[in-house]
């Protein structure tokens, strides 16, 4: 396994697997980990992968900083009701697509 594997490197299309997960799968699940929305099993698999994959760990760190920045800049602001409703609908639609029939 390359020390530099991860989503931003030339071989990001490989399914580099650390901790039982490929880089693409880890990148797709980063926000569920940051938001505390993944299962304990998925959290452990993500943790193992991030410990072994510097590229994905860098990506995780970037997303973590973005989340913190958004949290500090948007504190107390409330989205307009129309936007909130559109987001709710999109989340439901995405959940249905990911969850399947």
Curated annotation (Swiss-Prot):
Gene Ontology MF annotations: iron-sulfur cluster binding; metal ion binding; sigma factor antagonist activity
Conditions for induction: By SigH, part of the sigH-rshA operon.
Positions contributing to iron-sulfur cluster binding: 23, 49, 53, 56
InterPro entries for this protein: Anit_sigma_mycothiol_RsrA, Znf_put
Cofactor(s) of this protein: iron-sulfur cluster
PTM annotation: Phosphorylated, probably by PknB. Phosphorylation decreases interaction with SigH, leading to increased SigH-mediated transcription.
Superkingdom assignment: Bacteria
Keyword annotations from UniProtKB, A to Z: Iron, Iron-sulfur, Metal-binding, Phosphoprotein, Stress response, Transcription, Transcription regulation
Residue positions where Phosphothreonine is found in the record: 94
Presence of the UniProt keyword Plastid in the record: no
GO biological process: response to heat; response to oxidative stress
Region of interest: Inhibits SigH sigma factor activity: 9-15, 28-34, 38-44
Co-factor binding details: Binds 1 iron-sulfur cluster per subunit. As the iron-sulfur cluster is unstable, it is not clear from the contradictory experimental evidence whether it is 2Fe-2S, 4Fe-4S or something intermediate. Nor is it clear which other residues besides Cys-53 and Cys-56 are involved in metal binding.
Matching Pfam families: zf-HC2
Family recorded in the similarity comment: Belongs to the zinc-associated anti-sigma factor (ZAS) superfamily.
The protein's assembly and partners: Interacts (affinity=15 nM) 1:1 with cognate sigma factor SigH under reducing conditions; the complex is disrupted under oxiding conditions or as temperatures rise. Binding inhibits the interaction of SigH with the RNA polymerase catalytic core.
Function per UniProt: An redox-regulated anti-sigma factor for extracytoplasmic function (ECF) sigma factor SigH. ECF sigma factors are held in an inactive form by a cognate anti-sigma factor. RshA and some peptides derived from it inhibit the sigma factor activity of SigH. Probably releases SigH during oxidative stress.
Descriptive protein name: Anti-sigma factor RshA
Organism: Mycobacterium tuberculosis (strain ATCC 25618 / H37Rv)
Gene from which this protein is expressed: rshA
């Amino acid at each position: 396994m390359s020390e530099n594997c991860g989503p931003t490197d030339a071989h990001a299309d490989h399914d580099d697997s650390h901790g039982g997960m490929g880089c693409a799968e880890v990148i797709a699940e980063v926000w569920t980990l940051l938001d505390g929305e993944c299962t304990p099993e998925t959290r452990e698999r993500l943790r193992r992968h991030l410990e072994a994959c510097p590229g994905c760990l860098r990506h995780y760190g970037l997303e973590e900083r973005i989340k913190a920045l958004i949290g500090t800049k948007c504190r107390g602001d409330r989205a307009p009701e129309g936007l909130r409703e559109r987001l709710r609908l999109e989340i439901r639609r995405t959940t249905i697509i990911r969850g399947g029939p």
